[in-house]
UniProtKB/Swiss-Prot annotation:
One of its GO terms (molecular function) is ubiquitin-protein transferase activity. It is found in: Nucleus. Residues 3-151 form the UBC core domain. It comes from Danio rerio. Keywords: ATP-binding, DNA damage, DNA repair, Nucleotide-binding, Nucleus, Transferase, Ubl conjugation pathway. Accepts ubiquitin from the E1 complex and catalyzes its covalent attachment to other proteins. Catalyzes monoubiquitination. Involved in degradation of misfolded chaperone substrate and DNA repair. It is an enzyme of class 2 (transferase). This is Probable ubiquitin-conjugating enzyme E2 W-B. The lineage of its organism: Eukaryota, Metazoa, Chordata, Craniata, Vertebrata.
Length: 151
């Protein structure tokens, strides 16, 4: 537990002092707990999400960084994207099977920025309705199938 807290403190400071472009730590979210963070995000200029505001929820287990964080969009504005379900779940391999303890909150944020920035057309995944009705609340419990950068 102590190593997890030490690692999270280090990552928290890094996110506060040198956040990825368009991202800021929601300071209120970490006042009472180190294991759940909200990161505010603004869509990058020149993208289909330019100027839009989103929130990412990070939840860390006691096994972090050996276990990936649970990451999902939350709040009133979930991005419409082929890899983002309307309940906020994100189909991104580094959040599950491609996770490595060498990755960090910063690297997850950069991957999500990249994923959104490369989108040319706002649309939901084809199985959105079925998935949202039948999925587990924890996106890490989903068995994702990754095919050529699509889910």
């Amino acid at each position: 537990m102590a190593s997890m807290q030490k690692r999270l403190q280090k990552e928290l400071l890094a996110l506060q002092n040198d956040p990825p472009p368009g991202m800021t730590l929601n300071e209120k979210s970490v006042q009472n707990t180190i294991t759940q963070w909200i990161v505010d995000m603004e869509g990058a200029s020149g993208t289909v999400y330019e100027g839009e505001k989103f929130q990412l929820l990070f939840k860390f287990s006691s096994r972090y960084p050996f276990d990936s964080p649970q990451v999902m969009f939350t709040g009133d504005n979930i991005p419409v994207h082929p890899h983002v379900y309307s309940n906020g779940h994100i189909c991104l391999s580094i959040l599950t099977e491609d996770w490595s303890p060498a990755l960090s909150v910063q690297s997850v944020c950069l991957s999500i920025i990249s994923m959104l920035s490369s989108c040319k057309e706002k649309r939901r995944p084809p199985d959105n309705s079925f998935y949202v009705r039948t999925c587990n609340k924890n996106p890490k419990k989903t068995k994702w199938w990754y095919h050529d950068d699509t889910c």
